[in-house]
């Protein structure tokens, strides 16, 4: 099946982009594997006109927004993000009315319709940097409450999180899990995602996006790392650092990320579906805050 996928990909002129949380078999056939920021940047550099995206819906839509003239397909239309769906355009409009002079910063894990109402987009890799660079001591931030709290800690700014309880179910680790792994692996370094709750972040050695997690073993000579994010990241790290050991903090599985399989990936290439289609108005409006993010990052 892998050979068939690679053959069809080449014949039909597709490039395959996969998120770090995809199953190992899909990461291994992808042309590029990365976090949402890395994938967004990669999508802008591509000369190929056809992209098969392996991730969840908001990520595929992000690729489409940045590449409106390219064909973007996904294997499973139902692969979505519960956290992104917590935030609605109505909530954003309500808070804009309450705080008319406060910039709206939206995490990339949001719907395209919500992005169209934002001032700037951020990812878990650059949220702190983006908010620091805004000329405002207060920001409206959504939809991840934990990432919003982390940004407030790191920037000293007031962060109004919307909706009230927006969070990623996959990253709701327990601080006790860190205590347990420290007993089992006393020399290990613990790295957690900023979507984790504060008690977990506070007990970790490092807090970072999946893209940042990849860089830590380059600088830290530790032999064992405990990883607090979706289980798919372990495969990526083991491939990159075969001489180190990577242990999951908990068995955190995103069922939506796992909806993509070798079978439906092959079917997507055979039928060239399902195509990501967005209204032109949404693409134009959502692109502005995304490009603003790139501007702020330099």
Curated annotation (Swiss-Prot):
Cofactor: [4Fe-4S] cluster
Keyword match Ubl conjugation: no
Cell compartments where the protein resides: Cytoplasm
Binding locations of [4Fe-4S] cluster: 81, 168, 254
Domain of life: Bacteria
Pathway: Cofactor biosynthesis; NAD(+) biosynthesis; quinolinate from iminoaspartate: step 1/1
Gene Ontology CC: cytosol
EC number: 2.5.1.72
GO molecular function, one term: quinolinate synthetase A activity
Biological processes per GO annotation: 'de novo' NAD biosynthetic process from L-aspartate
Enzyme class: transferase
Cofactor mode of binding and number, as noted: Binds 1 [4Fe-4S] cluster per subunit.
Protein role: Catalyzes the condensation of iminoaspartate with dihydroxyacetone phosphate to form quinolinate.
HAMAP family: NadA_type2 (MF_00568)
Protein known as: Quinolinate synthase
Taxonomic lineage of the native organism: Bacteria, Thermotogati, Thermotogota, Thermotogae, Thermotogales
The encoding gene: nadA
């Amino acid at each position: 099946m892998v050979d068939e996928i690679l053959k069809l990909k080449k014949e039909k002129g597709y490039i395959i982009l996969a998120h770090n949380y995809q199953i190992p078999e899909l990461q291994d056939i992808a042309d590029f594997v990365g976090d949402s920021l890395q994938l967004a940047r990669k999508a802008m550099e591509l000369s190929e006109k056809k992209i098969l995206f392996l991730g969840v819906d908001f990520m595929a839509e992000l690729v489409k927004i940045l590449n409106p003239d390219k064909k973007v397909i996904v294997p499973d239309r139902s692969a979505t993000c519960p956290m992104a769906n917590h935030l609605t355009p109505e909530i954003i409009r309500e808070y804009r009315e309450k705080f008319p002079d406060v910039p709206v910063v939206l995490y990339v894990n949001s719907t395209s319709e919500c992005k169209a109402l934002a001032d700037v987009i951020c990812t878990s890799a650059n949220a702190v940097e983006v908010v620091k660079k805004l000329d405002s001591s207060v920001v409206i931030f959504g939809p991840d409450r934990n990432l919003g709290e982390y940004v407030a800690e790191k920037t000293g700014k007031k962060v109004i999180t919307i909706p009230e309880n927006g969070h990623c179910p996959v990253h709701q680790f327990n601080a006790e899990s860190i205590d347990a792994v420290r007993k089992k692996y006393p020399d290990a370094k613990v790295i957690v995602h900023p979507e984790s709750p504060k008690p977990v972040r506070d007990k970790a050695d490092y807090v970072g996006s999946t893209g940042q997690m990849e860089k830590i073993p380059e600088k830290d000579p530790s032999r064992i790392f405990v990883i607090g994010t979706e289980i798919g990241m372990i495969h990526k790290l083991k491939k990159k650092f075969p001489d180190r050991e990577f242990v999951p903090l908990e068995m955190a599985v995103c069922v939506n990320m796992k909806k993509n399989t070798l079978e439906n990936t092959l079917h997507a290439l055979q039928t060239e579906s399902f195509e990501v289609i967005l209204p032109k108005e949404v693409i134009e409006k959502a692109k502005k805050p995304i490009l603003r993010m790139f501007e702020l990052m330099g």
